[in-house]
Amino acid sequence: MRQLAALSAVIEEGSFERAAQRLHVTQSAVSQRVKQLEERLGQTLVVRTLPIHATEAGQQVLKHFRQISLLEQELRAGLSQRDARGFTRVSIGVNADSLETWFPDALSHLVQHEQLLMDLKVEDQDATQQLLKDGEVIGCISSSPKAMPGCLCVPLGVIPYRCLASAAYLERYFPHGVTAEAFRRAPVAEFSHKDQLQNRYLQQFFGIGPHEYPRHRIPSSTAFCDMIVRGLACGMVPEQQGAPLIASGAVQEMTPGRYLAVPLYWHVWNLSSNLVRRLTDELVAEAARQLDPFDVHPRLTHPG
């Protein structure tokens, strides 16, 4: 297990030096443990660049180690043998908009009462499943309804996304109305190159391709909304964040009645784990309180 723990630390920290600091051993000891594990398995497990990252084989070993660690942590908890400080670490993949809205409410009870340390990895809702596939997380929030092998897929609910803009932005870029021609000259905000919501909205309602309009990339939900309020861009905003901005008059919906309904699902390892069950129960319960039911939206926006 020491060799597996060393591999996990190196991949998570991105370097042998930081892994050594985390494990409270020398850098050479960490390097030796990883090398011994590679020799034992006959596979290269990490690519020794900066930052260090796992090979495909390393990802599979890491996934196996994390599953074992989760079950071991549960056993220790049952025997009152958590780590030295009494915490259990849990890695989850989540999209930025969920993290800014309903997701913290879902986890607050468990984090406080189960003494969990959360390691949240933020990705677009179309891309979080890759984190699960690579073994980086035990579960993820995703817009895909397709369960991966060895995992469960639990429906959570739907988030409506609406294209919002300020009055100043509309006056500058859309003086003659919201048209496809005007969109081709107007800057649009996107979270990252993986964010496809703007592309889908413009393709679905205006027939505009993904490279036919200027865009800002803003990898922060808060800054994303701020750019829109300042009149520097328009963009797809989840209803929970957008509704107060609309009510205050800071922004308005560009095309009322035209929106994207993004479904969310909880994908998690299919383990006989009390922690996995409790996580799932908390997420489902909070989603029922804060997200829309699936049957409210006849057309859902799945990854393409």
Stretches found by the model and what they are:
Residues 8-24:
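Short helix-boundary/capping micro-motifs
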Residues 13, 22, 36-44:
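Residue cluster at the C-terminal edge of the helix-turn-helix DNA-binding motif
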Residues 26, 33-36:
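Residues within the DNA-recognition helix of helix-turn-helix
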Residues 38-56:
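A short LG(V/I)-centered, amphipathic sequence patch enriched
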Residues 40-41, 61-83, 283, 290:
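Alpha-helical linker/hinge and terminal dimerization helices associated
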Residues 85-149:
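Central regulatory/effector-binding core of bacterial HTH transcription factors
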Residues 153-232, 246-259, 289-304:
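C-terminal regulatory
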Residues 256-300:
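A late-sequence structural motif
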